[in-house]
């Protein structure tokens, strides 16, 4: 099997470089779901369904209603997914948008 092991973070700021890490967890999906993620099995299932595409995981539904304030929340994923190196970063405009778009993967 190809390894899948990640470190996931959530921070307050426009980019990972500008923000402090507020929360961080580990997520391993093969050979079995594990790590410090509170729902490792659910997060791995969601990532597998998305084919490891984090943009699909963080996609916000078009009918989401949030304020238009700029109070950015950034999420990151670093590590290996299905044997490929991953370095992912996504910035949500505010905590409401982050809650709407983080999916199970960034729910910690």
Curated annotation (Swiss-Prot):
Site (Reactive bond): 68-69
InterPro entries: Prot_inh_I16_SSI (IPR000691), Prot_inh_SSI_I16_CS (IPR020054), Subtilisin_inhibitor (IPR023549), Subtilisin_inhibitor-like_sf (IPR036819)
Keyword Hydrolase carried by entry: no
Cellular compartments annotated: Secreted
S-S pairs: 29-44, 66-96
Assembly, per entry: Homodimer.
Family of the protein in this entry: Belongs to the protease inhibitor I16 (SSI) family.
The protein's name: Protease inhibitor SIL-V3
